[in-house]
Amino acid sequence: VMVPPGRSRSSRNGRRAEQEALAKAASDPNNPQSAEDIARQLEGVSDLVGTPGQEGAVDGTTTPTPEELAALAEEGALDQPIEPDPLRPAPLPGLDEEGSFGRIPRSADDGTTPFDAYKRPFDRVEGQPYVAIIVTGIGLNSTRTKAAIEDLPLNISLALSPYANNLQQVASDARAMGHEIFLQLPMEPIDFPLSDPGPRALLTSLPEGENLVRLEWLLARFPGYAGVVSYLGSKFGSLDSAIRPVIEFVDRTGLMYVEGTNSGSVSLGAQLASNADSPNAVGNIMIDEIPSRRQIDARLNDLVELAKSNGVAVGIAQSYPVTIQRLRNWSSRLARQGVQLAPVSALAKLQVTPQSADEAEAARRDAALAEERAQKDAAPSDTGDGESETIEN
């Protein structure tokens, strides 16, 4: 496949078609041209289409660089559809029970947990570095949801917002494609109410019983999820008295707990889950806190380096169009960097070391004292109790 030198430059669509034809040609085993030859031709066509790496102003799309196009050509990945690898329809018998607001997860009588039953099958190899990605906010926007389900690699996990409509259908579609799914748990952030986790969020101002009622409502939103992912929650998740009852409840349901809030710090929730021997993970890097091509690519590179250093790394992303595009591009080249993409469930219990019973009890006492001091510091000083100090001359 060659680029005719006299081709008109008036049609962007025609030039993009040339890009795609060249990329596909590189994956054709009968094509005599080398990948380098095709990369040079792609560079010429890319120059006609637009500035490499420049982001669109509206939809967050970018013009791929020649290097990216050549890499995609070698993989045969450009515009190749993801083939479904369906997971079993949910709910499965014996893995739910009636709650206050509908069916909620539970472990089966034979010991099978919802985590065991609903995670995506994956075999880890000892010594191989792995990265996992959770894309959040699924269900809130139908176009982005469709793109995430259909265009992302199946080993990328999807977290559904409890506030989305038609959640059972979204969950069914995601699992039918082959993605494992998680439920987002909205929790109070430090800057609440400036950052608003929504009307059913878990709040430090509520009594434990009310938060557990809200938790039941959240857990009943749809079936088939392998675990929960904290959303916001930088304040709620840092208070032992607030997060501990939630983790204990999640542990009883047999679900995985993923800390999706603290950008790499070992959260109290993940530590409590680890101490209970529940499956858990911690999001190390927020991939698209700044949703630009270059920033996303930089964060993904950081994630790969962290995986090479620590053995595993977990990224948290949102379902922006540019994020989905960059994730697909990045994942097609990941194996060449010596790192494999895994579902987040496959990395359970690999990041947080369980505390001994003595360590856990000491941490609990320290947390209780810290909360008590914080409450005293926040309380107004009492100057109206009728007592007065004796002033000595």
Please report, for each region that a protein language model flagged, where it lies by residue:
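Glycine-rich anion/phosphate-binding loops
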Residues: 163-168, 205-213
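Active-site mouth loops of central-metabolism enzymes
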Residues: 130-137, 199-209, 289-296
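A short, acidic, amphipathic alpha-helical segment used as a generic capping/interface helix at domain edges
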Residues: 295-309
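Active-site beta->alpha N-cap acidic-glycine motif
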Residues: 110-195
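Hydrophobic faces of well-ordered beta-strands that scaffold small-molecule active sites
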Residues: 131-135, 156-160, 181-185, 228-230, ...
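Catalytic domains of cell-wall/extracellular-matrix polysaccharide-remodeling enzymes
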Residues: 208-297, 318-335, 339
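Juxtamembrane proline-rich low-complexity "stalk" or linker regions positioned immediately after a signal peptide
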Residues: 2-106
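C-terminal domain-boundary segment and adjacent tail
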Residues: 250-265, 269, 319-392
